[in-house]
Amino acid sequence: MKLMIASDIHGSAYWCKKMLEAFEQNGAERLILLGDILYHGPRNDLPKEYAPKQVIAMLNPLKDKLLCVRGNCDTEVDQMVLDFPVMAEYAYICCDNLRIFATHGHKYNCTNLPPLSKGDILLHGHTHVPVIKDCGDYTLSLIHI
């Protein structure tokens, strides 16, 4: 199964559109969103084309293709307008003999690891800096759109 992974849209219609174009062009079957979907948070500047309602309108039709976890800027109010679950702190994904631990990164990350087994993959966003790192027994991937 082909997965696309993104994080930290922060309500940007511009980056959401770019992400969905890449999702379509690459023929991915599922889109994993690692949190911070609609709100930019009090410490961050407004992202390019900040338009949470447009992001909602773009993502809701894809609800059956999305797997999302909660970011530190996501709240219960966001869940009220999104047609797909966004409140889980993490998700285990088993795909093509891989076990993936997907989380936002504000709780579990490379300095505070979740329970991982040899060969597992840890996905998280939050840092806004993309990184893929082989850590011996597991692989660390920090994602940002």
Task: Kindly label every feature range from the protein language model.
Residues 1-3, 93-100, 134-140:
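Beta-strand-turn-beta hairpins that frame and shape the catalytic cleft
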Residues 2-95:
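Core catalytic region of metal-dependent phosphoesterases/phosphodiesterases
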Residues 8-9, 102-108, 120-130:
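Histidine-centered catalytic micro-motifs
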Residues 64-67, 99-100, 120-121:
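Short active-site oxyanion
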Residues 77-82, 112-117, 131-137:
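Short loop/helix-cap segments at secondary-structure boundaries that form the rim of catalytic
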Residues 82-117:
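Repeat-unit-sized solenoid/scaffold elements
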Residues 143-145:
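Conserved small/polar residues in nucleotide/adenosyl-binding loops
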